[in-house]
Swiss-Prot record:
EC top class, as a word: transferase
Protein's name in the database: S-adenosylmethionine:tRNA ribosyltransferase-isomerase
Chief location bin: cytoplasm
Similarity annotation: Belongs to the QueA family.
Localization terms from the record: Cytoplasm
Taxonomic classification: Bacteria, Thermotogati, Thermotogota, Thermotogae, Thermotogales
GO MF annotation list: S-adenosylmethionine:tRNA ribosyltransferase-isomerase activity
Catalytic activity: 7-aminomethyl-7-carbaguanosine(34) in tRNA + S-adenosyl-L-methionine = epoxyqueuosine(34) in tRNA + adenine + L-methionine + 2 H(+)
Keyword Ligase in annotation: no
InterPro entries documented for this protein: QueA, QueA_dom1, QueA_dom2, QueA_sf
Keywords on record: Cytoplasm, Queuosine biosynthesis, S-adenosyl-L-methionine, Transferase
Function (record text): Transfers and isomerizes the ribose moiety from AdoMet to the 7-aminomethyl group of 7-deazaguanine (preQ1-tRNA) to give epoxyqueuosine (oQ-tRNA).
Segments passing through the bilayer: none
Gene Ontology CC terms, in alphabetical order: cytoplasm
């Protein structure tokens, strides 16, 4: 398939600049894959579509305050975006402007806190060693909001309410729509919950630069699926319930582990790239936001629901002025 097959027109004003309050008041487009039917609801109406015996699989990763502003000894301003911890006090990071940071360059954050560039990393990143603890480092940082969000948004609002495992540089945004009250209603209905971790890296958002999408290489991301979740997944399948993935990160993790030898728990890195045609072996339904044109995430939902149906739904969403991307509205696809 070609990259241009996943393009669509999106007016800039439909890119959500701030989240909806309360979280579950966001709009919800419901897509029935089999009947090719589209409905328009509010996110809290998801209760109507989830049933007793369904398993809602959530990514409980927590976003780190990854964006930090510093300066060189010359006074030149440098922006640091933490990507991944390599070892104690050593991180892979993006730096801006990159031309000003070479091997041995020191970046100061205040009078006592600084980092030194040890080396170049992959694709223009840098390996930085900090002279402060992780806790002190995180106090200097702020939410790494996507570049298309121009408004300031509180760090807490860029986390899911159930986030607990620190390590992502972007939120698993499908989960941002859930409230405590909504989770309680789902629980009362008999919906089960299971948690996994996939630490979202910038690779998820890396633009596809090749017209033949099969040539695109995904960046690998760390995941962990505990034994309790593994057991719940296979019990749900055995009992005829549905595996409902909250977000594309949960989908990628689930469809990674089902292709591995059966284990009690799973821990590793995945670079799975899901695009049409793809055989989904675990995921039966998906909660997700509206994704960028030509993105790997749009390819994933196209693989799940059919490209033509998804592109039709996106065009309808544009006409009906749905809000797009990280703080935008949601889709439920089943």
């Amino acid at each position: 398939m070609k990259l241009s097959d996943f393009d669509y027109y999106l007016p800039e004003e439909l890119i959500a600049q701030k989240p909806v309050e309360p979280r579950d008041a966001s709009r919800l487009m419901v897509l029935n894959r089999k009947e090719k039917k589209i409905e328009h609801k509010i996110f809290r109406n998801i209760v109507e579509y989830l049933h007793e015996g369904d398993l809602l699989v959530r990514n409980v990763t927590k976003v780190i305050p990854a964006r930090i502003y510093g300066r060189k000894e010359t006074g030149a301003k440098i922006e640091v975006l933490l990507l991944e911890k390599i070892s104690e006090n050593v991180w892979e990071a993006l730096v801006k402007p990159g031309s000003k940071v070479k091997k041995g360059t020191k970046i100061y954050f205040d009078d006592e806190s600084y980092c030194v560039c040890l080396d170049w990393g992959d694709e223009g990143s840098r390996i930085l060693e900090f002279n402060i603890t992780e806790e002190e480092l995180f106090k200097l940082g702020e939410a790494p909001l996507p570049p298309y969000v121009k408004n300031k948004v509180s760090f807490e609002r860029y986390q899911t309410i159930y986030s607990r495992e620190t390590g992502s540089v972007a939120a698993p945004t499908a989960g941002l729509h859930f409230t405590e009250d909504l989770l309680k209603k789902l629980e009362e209905k008999g919906v089960e919950f299971a948690d996994l971790v996939l630490h979202v890296g910038l690779g998820t958002f890396r633009p596809v630069k090749v017209e033949n999408i099969t040539e695109h290489k995904m960046h690998s991301e760390s995941y962990y699926v505990p034994n309790e979740t593994v057991k719940k997944i296979f019990e749900t399948k055995k009992n005829g319930g549905r595996i409902v993935a909250v977000g594309t990160t949960s989908v990628r993790t689930l469809e990674t582990i089902v292709r591995l030898e059966r284990k009690e728990s799973y821990h590793g890195k995945t670079d799975i790239f899901i695009y049409p045609p793809f055989e989904f072996k675990l995921v039966d339904a998906l909660i997700t936001n509206f994704h960028l044109p030509k993105s790997t995430l749009l390819m994933l939902v196209s693989a799940f629901a059919g490209r033509e149906f998804i592109m039709e739904a996106y065009n309808i969403a544009v006409k009906m002025k749905y809000r797009f991307f990280s703080f935008g509205n949601a889709c439920f696809i089943y």
